């Protein structure tokens, strides 16, 4: 089973990413489960998302404490210890950043396999917005191959109509531009 945990700030529409990835996996004949949880403090509100995908029925129904994959929609969230907590030793972290993987390793002491993508720039260039959900989904698909990239296109078109094409284009660009660096030993 592939277990993924997403971290975002409120308003980044991370819930849509969780839902779309879950629906795409189901459309591909896999078992999938996805849900989100909001947490708020006096300073700011954040959202965590959880996705499980498997070839077998999923009987768990809990938050994911030890994910195979952590997806961070806002690099500033890495300053919070709980964001990377529990990542499996063979785990992968995908991050929205303009920094190279080695810069992330130096800044945050991350030893996991890293996938980095400039999702903010892609969203601005293609969508004219700061909505990073489509580019981050492209990065997730590149790193995990959990579903074919094309599995998202009909879902985006169905949900967003004509704007779905631009969202799929952002997803495709992120898929191509995501840089993966294997974990450090």
Summary of predicted features, one role per range:
Residues 1-185:
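Active-site cofactor/cluster-binding pocket
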